[in-house]
């Protein structure tokens, strides 16, 4: 009789300790915005202008815009609502091809992408950190610091200046 009571007490203490140490639930969207692997930069421009400015700047730097994915429009076409959200897929074979030759699996990280979204806080440009892109690959930062890393600088400059 004492043994079952002790077991129940131990279980209750364990559950109580777990409940006290539990952190508040974080949604995937919140997790992405605070991740050091993802950068979120406030744009000083309206949503549509931010998308256009990024596309123009990417092309002006000799890169190709491979696709523009309008998630908001796709949602509406399916009877759903969401905030404005557009992903620009871009890059240049001159920069990406040597990296994919060195590490074929790196093709999963390319082309680069930037999300432009409208939040209650304003328009934001969201993109993956260059070091996070190469993490786990055979690519060294020195191989991308003058190519892929420049895309981060370009995005920041376009939306903040």
Language model regions located:
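Bacterial N-terminal signal peptides that target proteins for export
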Residues: 1-7
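C-terminal motif of bacterial Sec signal peptides marking the signal peptidase cleavage site
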Residues: 16-17
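Terminal, regulation- and interaction-focused segments at domain boundaries
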Residues: 21-62, 157
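Compact, glycine-rich, soluble single-domain proteins
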Residues: 46-47, 55, 59-116, 130
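Beta-strand/loop substructures that line and gate deep hydrophobic ligand-binding cavities in soluble
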Residues: 113-141
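C-terminal partner/receptor-binding element of secreted or periplasmic proteins
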Residues: 130-161
């Amino acid at each position: 009789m004492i043994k079952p009571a002790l077991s129940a007490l131990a279980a209750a203490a364990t559950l109580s300790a777990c409940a006290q140490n539990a952190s508040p639930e974080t949604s995937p969207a919140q997790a992405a915005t605070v991740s050091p692997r993802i950068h979120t930069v406030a744009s000083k421009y309206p949503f549509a202008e931010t998308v256009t400015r990024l596309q123009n700047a990417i092309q002006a730097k000799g890169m190709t815009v491979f696709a523009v994915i309008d998630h908001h429009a796709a949602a509406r076409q399916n009877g759903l609502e969401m905030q404005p959200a557009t992903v620009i897929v871009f890059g240049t074979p001159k920069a990406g091809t040597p990296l994919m030759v060195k590490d074929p699996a790196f093709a999963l990280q390319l082309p680069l992408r930037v999300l432009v979204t409208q939040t209650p806080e304003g328009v934001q440009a969201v993109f993956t950190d260059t070091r996070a892109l190469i993490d786990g690959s055979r690519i060294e930062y020195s191989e991308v610091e003058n190519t892929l890393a420049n895309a981060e600088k370009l995005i920041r400059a376009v939306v903040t200046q």
